[in-house]
């Protein structure tokens, strides 16, 4: 059976126009965003989230890669180190809350392989340790 993406990715980032309100998003801290899946519950699994403002295509590639791995039976939990996303480093999964539900945030280390809790972790990578509501600035557009 051919793998089929049967979940959605919801992405909010600076510069993105809201289809519903027609306003341009501008409220995230520089280097931060909120891209996350909806639909992993059909596999009895938490959804995934990324808050590092990579290009949308890269964020979707990573989120879909994780979703496809779940679809074929892999299970992930808080604290797991996951290989196969990047050739030169593992990513870490950390449980966070996103709009009232638990998700596994995919944490990418900086170019020196340092994670956010390392005091020398570079900007914007250290922002990945902030709660979802804390990557938002006052005065920005929010639905």
Question: What name fits each language-model region?
Answer:
Residues 1-32, 40-143:
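Acidic, proline/glycine-rich low-complexity IDRs
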Residues 37:
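Histidine-anchored nucleotide/phosphate-binding helix
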């Amino acid at each position: 059976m051919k793998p089929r993406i049967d979940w959605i990715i919801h992405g909010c980032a600076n510069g993105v126009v809201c289809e519903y309100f027609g306003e341009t998003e501008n409220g995230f801290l520089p280097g931060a965003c909120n891209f996350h899946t909806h639909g992993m519950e059909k596999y009895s699994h938490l959804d995934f989230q990324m808050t590092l403002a990579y290009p949308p295509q890269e964020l979707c590639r990573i989120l879909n890669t994780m979703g496809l791995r779940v679809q074929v039976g892999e299970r992930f939990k808080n604290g797991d180190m996951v290989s196969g996303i990047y050739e030169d480093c593992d990513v870490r999964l950390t449980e966070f809350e996103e709009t009232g539900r638990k998700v596994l945030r995919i944490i990418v280390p900086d170019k020196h392989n340092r994670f956010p809790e390392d005091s020398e972790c570079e900007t914007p990578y250290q922002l990945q340790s902030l709660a979802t509501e804390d990557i938002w600035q006052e005065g920005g557009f929010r639905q």
